[in-house]
Design a protein with these regions (language model features):
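Core domains of carbohydrate- and sulfate-ester-processing enzymes
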Residues: 76-92
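Outer-membrane beta-barrel and related beta-rich outer-membrane complex signature
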Residues: 59, 162-166
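Conserved, well-structured interaction surfaces
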Residues: 54, 90-162, 175-186, 192-208
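Bacterial Sec-dependent N-terminal signal peptides
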Residues: 1-29
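Non-transmembrane alpha-helical segments in soluble domains
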Residues: 44-48, 189, 196
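Short linear capping/connector segments at secondary-structure termini
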Residues: 31, 167-175
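An alpha-helical repeat/solenoid feature that recognizes helix-turn-helix modules
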Residues: 212-213
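Membrane-proximal, proline-rich intrinsically disordered regions
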Residues: 21-75
Length: 213
């Protein structure tokens, strides 16, 4: 019995000694590439990049959404639903997946291209909500207003294409509400009216490193 007690005490001592070797309040990242800070300007750039790019590696790669990354961009998805069913476009390859319903204005939620558009708009709204929630009070009002404009643009496309939107203005774990028709229109109108005085003058960035915003 004495030997068992001694062995147990020794094991407990070694365990406590091992645990105390690390000062939990002063641990540095093991990976030297790891950083707890980030460049806010790069985060701002991502908000604008979401209009044209589809992922994290420039023109393609590590896509924002699963599926055919090339079909998932903001401009392309909005263009598909707005223009492919008009006289401005003649799409000769009607055997392409779900192309016939789109060109004949008979598309439904079963269409991959419709889903990509809906998901792209929802993803971008979430991206903008995160930026606005985390940076309001830290960045100038005009920069926050820019992203509020981009968010309103996505909600406008929701209204134009689907007449409704999963509506949310905060970045948290709560599910969005739904705004439909005139309610969504009124919010967009009020939001744009509210941010207009905060926006930079037209051409304010033309001679700066921020050209293109």
């Amino acid at each position: 019995m004495k030997h068992i007690i001694l062995k147990s005490a020794a094991l407990a001592f070694l365990t406590l000694g091992t645990m105390s070797c690390a000062d939990d309040l002063n641990i540095s990242p093991i990976d030297p590439q790891t950083s707890s800070s980030y460049d806010v300007k790069q985060l701002l750039a991502k908000q604008y990049a979401s209009l044209g790019l589809t992922g994290q590696k420039g023109p393609d790669g590590n896509g924002d959404m699963s599926g055919d990354e090339g079909e998932s961009g903001f401009y392309r998805t909005v263009f598909n639903l707005n223009e492919l069913n008009t006289d401005e476009i003649l799409w000769a390859w009607q055997d392409n997946e779900d192309m016939a319903p789109i060109t004949n204005m008979a598309w439904t939620s079963a269409s991959p291209r419709v889903n990509w558009c809906y998901q792209r708009l929802a993803y971008d709204v979430t991206l903008h909500n995160q930026f606005i929630s985390e940076q309001t009070g830290k960045l100038p009002d005009d920069e926050i207003a820019e992203i509020r404009f981009l968010r309103a643009l996505n909600y406008f496309e929701f209204l134009d294409l689907f007449r409704r939107a999963p509506f949310k203005l905060e970045f948290n774990g709560e599910l969005p509400d739904e705004k439909v028709g005139i309610d969504l229109y009124n919010w967009i109108d009020q939001e744009l009216t509210a941010i207009e005085p905060m926006m930079k003058e037209v051409g304010a960035y033309c001679n700066s490193k921020d050209f293109g915003r």
